[in-house]
Amino acid sequence: MSFRGGRGGGGGFRGGRGGGGGGGFRGGRGGDRGGGFRGGRGGFGGGGRGGYDQGPPEEVVLVGVFSHQCQDDIVCNNTSGKIPYFNAPIYFKNKEQVGKIDEIFGSPGENGFSVTLSQGVKASSFEPESQLYIDPGKLLPVDRFLPQAGGGRGRGGRGRGGDRGGRGSDRGGRGGFGRGGGGGFRGGDRGGFGGGRGGFRGGDRGGFRGGRGGDFGGRGRGDFKRSYDGGSFGGQNNKRTKFE
């Protein structure tokens, strides 16, 4: 059984790059919205691109023990009873950083993880059952990944304007606060802050910059250009030829 699933990730054990929406075990790049076990790049694990090193935490707790080497990475058994964040830093007991979590695999109750080692740390230097530590703030309770007693809240009844993304919602969709759909905060195609038709910058019809029928050279018959009537702007070439 494949743990990672494919790039489409619809219900795979880990999901894939497109996971997160199909109940995959790990989720994919889309984060933890779809019940993914791990959250992917940009998921609840944070990290990813744009992060920075905050230094060692004030406290570290045991998260797992070394199992075996896999190429340049190491594979560990999770002994914490919780689920670590993706990309969470891993330390020795003295808070020296070993690397960062790369993969999480297994079931919510029994799982392990792989660690991409920091520069200068060799996978061959680890002995069996070597203990590894983590910031306790980078662990999540297993209950978060188990089915809820009531089966969870259904999807019915949200409609347009619901709390997750109808028109005018605060999370996305058309008119969403953060995603910039139609009329969104960041601007979208129609009525957005940044442009589009009738937008703040103006667009094709009636916009701020002028369009058809505008003042400064639109396609219609505006005030700036003179029509073909022999006016002063046309010169000799614009005069009508009189035939006797």
UniProtKB/Swiss-Prot annotation:
What are the entry keywords? Nucleus, Repeat, Ribonucleoprotein, Ribosome biogenesis, RNA-binding, rRNA processing
An example GO biological process term is: snoRNA guided rRNA pseudouridine synthesis
The answer to keyword rRNA processing applying to this record is: yes
Q: What is the protein's name according to its record?
A: Probable H/ACA ribonucleoprotein complex subunit 1-like protein
Biological function: Required for ribosome biogenesis. Part of a complex which catalyzes pseudouridylation of rRNA. This involves the isomerization of uridine such that the ribose is subsequently attached to C5, instead of the normal N1. Pseudouridine ('psi') residues may serve to stabilize the conformation of rRNAs. Involved in phase separation into sub-nucleolar condensates. Essential for normal development and also plays a role in fertility.
Q: Which GO terms describe its cellular component?
A: box H/ACA snoRNP complex
**Which species is the source of this protein?**
Caenorhabditis elegans
Query: Which PANTHER family does the UniProt record give?
Result: H_ACA RIBONUCLEOPROTEIN COMPLEX SUBUNIT 1, NUCLEOLAR PROTEIN FAMILY A MEMBER 1 SNORNP PROTEIN GAR1
Q: Any idea where this protein resides?
A: Nucleus, Nucleolus
Compositionally biased residues, Basic and acidic residues:
160-173, 218-228
- Self-association and partners: Component of the small nucleolar ribonucleoprotein particle containing H/ACA-type snoRNAs (H/ACA snoRNPs).
User: Could you tell me the gene encoding this protein?
Assistant: garr-1
- Provide the transmembrane region boundaries: none
Biased region (Gly residues) positions are 174-201, 208-217
Q: Where is this region: RGG-box 2?
A: 153-222
Q: Say which family it is in.
A: Belongs to the GAR1 family.
- For the keyword RNA-binding, the answer is yes
| One GO MF term attached to the UniProt entry | box H/ACA snoRNA binding
Per its UniProt entry, which superkingdom is the organism in?
A: Eukaryota
- Domain remarks in the Swiss-Prot or TrEMBL record: Arginine-glycine RGG-box regions play a role in sub-nucleolar compartmentalization. Dispensable for nucleolar accumulation. Both regions are essential for fertility and development.
Q: Where is this region: RGG-box 1?
A: 4-51
Its lineage reads: Eukaryota, Metazoa, Ecdysozoa, Nematoda, Chromadorea
Show the segment(s) annotated as Disordered: 1-53, 145-244
